[in-house]
Amino acid sequence: QANQDFMRF
């Protein structure tokens, strides 16, 4: 679930 990691911005 890298989506959440990308939304950390």
Curated annotation (Swiss-Prot):
Keywords: Amidation, Neuropeptide, Pyrrolidone carboxylic acid, Secreted. The modification Phenylalanine amide is found at F9. The keyword Secreted applies. It is found in: Secreted. Detected in the thoracic perisympathetic organs in larvae, and the dorsal ganglionic sheath in adults (at protein level). GO terms for cellular component: extracellular region. Its main location: secreted. One of its GO terms (biological process) is neuropeptide signaling pathway. The modification Pyrrolidone carboxylic acid is found at Q1. Belongs to the FARP (FMRFamide related peptide) family. This is FMRFamide-7. It comes from Lucilia cuprina (Green bottle fly). The lineage of its organism: Eukaryota, Metazoa, Ecdysozoa, Arthropoda, Hexapoda.
